[in-house]
Each structure stands twice: as structure tokens, then as C-alpha cells.
């Protein structure tokens, strides 16, 4: 027993003292009493074994050696089991520091977790600049070789990110009533991305009654934490804007033709025309994946936010607006013929032949074959501009022109004209429905729940159309509407619980989109002139 008594205290003090010197029993008693008196932390609950030791210590039938050994035993056991923080591996501690850096940098932890998994699986990734810079400090070879799935640090980081994301979600759910989770998620259109997929899930229905659907817009639902929702929406908007601005900057530095990119993106979004391979590769190189799966609604795709930012950037570069389109520059062959005509020693037959050749070369083939239907104003068709969009533009430049005449002015094959005419008329049939739509006041649309921002009042943070440009009720060329996810009959006003989220857009652009593909851009249900009044709401001052 004396040998056991000497080993117990000696082992304990050699483990915890920093000077490496053993201490006496008196020092042990005094230090133990001082530490217990000065410690600000409460001791942990006693385990059953420790409670048994305390009862044994209170027994008077113990020898001095046995009592000393029992007093040292709990300390030795406690010293052999340090707290969880002390047992953390270096990789776990480094992963914790990485998460803290990401939080301080405003990174989207859920996106980082997903992209980190993609890197380890050799799949495509899209980090923001902040996320990439932080990760490169700890994974310097990530751009060249990726991250091995056997990396201890990467797996620790994924686990820590998963825990943090779950904690954040639990905090949000505890602060927001579950009753309002469905109706509030996705209702504020801060940007064109980040919509909750539960709004697009078939079969989800509201439990509200028919009387609730006939109530006016509730701008302040009870129990909704507006401040938290506003901060979360602003964080999503800033994160998306940072990614988009970084992509635009890199594309500009790489010399990509932004006008051509805007036109190609417009055709891709409006009619799913394939992007040119070089532009598709350029977008993928900056983290923008242009592929739109069939199961994903159009409004959920980040390429829409990029398209809106691209339109804003190019609009700010324009020095003049509504300027008439200039004719194309004369070709070198045409310039040579004109110089030849100015030379005096030409025979009359030669001069007539050159003049006739110039007239034929100056006129497009469509004009030579369709001189009878030549329009007064007919600019050339832009690159990647489809026939429907070009015909609508020609009709706007030539008021009063019949649709068939407009199409015949640039489509030489009579067999190919009818389909274009039908698509244009389908788009034009939707436009008159604007005056028949149910209305939402601008004040209600600008509420925290709906989040509309007129470009005239918010030039730096305006709401963008689903198909690109910024929206304003003062713009005479726009018909601003809010398109709901779920339909309701015409007499009923907008109800957030029944109609779900609103996506703001220009009805003219929507009509052009529906002419080629009559599908609801949010849920892919059929949408045409017959049922658009069940989904759309006109925004009025």
C-alpha cells in the first residue's frame, strides 16, 4: 500500500507541473485548495464512481495511506482524460480555423461544403473569390491537382462545415415559425437566384382556406422576423453579386465579346438555342455553368443573374440611347467599284454593267427576291438573333406593317414563313392580356415580403426582369408584372399563401419567350394567352 500511495500523487503532479519538480504533500493540499477557491468554473457533475469515492472518504475507518491514495485517484483519472478540446487533432483545429475565416469573410458555408465535395470527387466547382482565396491558403495545390479524398484536413473541414451549416439551419428554424416557412421562403426577390426548391415541388399545397385567398396582401405577417429575413436576403444578394462581378471582370480581361455574349445568352434563355462552344467554355472557366436541367425551373438558374448583370454593365457603357442603326460599312469590293466608276476612260457598256453589279451586290438576297415587301426601316439581323425576335423588332420599327409582310421581307423560303408567323402571333396575342390582369399596387410590391425595387427609385439596386433588363413602372416600353407560382381565378387578389412567390418581369419579354416555348418559367406548366391571367399580376403605381 505505501508503494501505491507514492505512485499515485507522483504521477499526477509530474503530468501537470511545468517546472518538472515533484511537490510535497503540503504544496499539493495548498495548491488544490487555492485552485478550487479561485476557479471561475463550476465542477462537472460527479460520476457514480466519484460519488462512491466521496462516501468512502467520509468513512472514519480508513488509514492515512488509503485516504491519501483515494484523494489522488480522481485527479489521476481526470488527468488521463483531458477535455475534448485538448484531444482534437491538429487537422481538426486547422479545420475549425478555416471555418472561422470563411464566416468572417461572409462566405456561403453550404456552397463551400458542396464545392469541396465536388473538388474531392473531381467534379466542376464554382467558388467565390473570398472562398477560393481562403482555401488556397490551406490547399495550395487545389487548382492544379485538386484535393485527394484521403486528405485528413479536407475530411475534417467537410465534417466541421456540415456541423456549422446544421447549427445555422437549426437557429433559423427556431427563430422562424414553421407555419410561415413555406410562405416566406423565396417570396422576396432580392436576386434571380437562390429560390427555394420547395416552391417548385409538385404536390405542395397550402392549407389555407378559400376565404384567406380573398384577403388583401398581408405586408406584415405575424411572427415573421423581418429583420432576420432582410439580413439573410441581403447576404444572399451580396454573395451572388460578388460571384457575378468577378465573372464579368475575368471575362472582360480575357477579351470576350460582351455584346455577342449578351445576344447569345438572350437566345439561350428565351428559346434554349445552344450557346457557341467558345462562349460556353468561357462561362465555365469563370464558374458559370450554363446548362439548365429539365427538372430545374428557369428562375432557379444562376445564369439569369449573370445575364441581368451583363445587361446592366453594357447599358452603363452606352453613350447614346435610341439612336438609329447605321448601315454597315461598304465592303472593299464595293469601294473598288465606286473608285472605278469615277475614272473617266470607261465605255458606256462597262459603266452600265458596273452600276448594275453594284445594285445587286448592295441589296441583300431577301430584298432582291422580295422587293415588293421591302420595309421602310430594315436594319440587318443581329448575330444569334432568332427570326421571331428579329421580326418583332422589324414590326416595332415599321408601325402598321402586317406580320406576314414583315416575315416575308427577310425569309425567302415561303414554306418556312408560316411557323414564324404563328410564333409571332402567339406572342402578340399575350400582349393585350396585360390590361385585363389583376393588379398589385406598387406599395404592396415594394413590401419586405415581395421586395420589388423600381429602377427609377433604386438605380443602384433595382429589380431585374427574369430575362435581363431592370424594371421600372415609368418605362413606357415595359409591362411590369409579377408572375406567381400557383394559379388562382381572376376575381381573387394576390395571396402569398396560395399563389406563393412572385417573380417580376416584363410581360413583353415573357410573351416572346412563350411564343417559342409556352411553358411557365417557374414550374414548367403550360402557359399561354388563355391562362396567363391566372398567374400574372399587373404592378400599378
UniProtKB/Swiss-Prot annotation:
Localization: Secreted
One term under GO cellular component: extracellular region
Superkingdom, taxonomy of origin: Bacteria
Originating organism: Pseudomonas savastanoi (Pseudomonas syringae pv. savastanoi)
Region (Disordered): 1-94, 168-222, 317-338
Gene of this entry: hopAB1
Keyword field: Hypersensitive response elicitation, Secreted, Virulence
Compositional bias per record (Basic and acidic residues), positions renumbered to this chain: 18-31
UniProt name for this protein: Effector protein hopAB1
Composition bias, Low complexity: 183-196
GO terms classed as biological process: symbiont-mediated perturbation of host programmed cell death
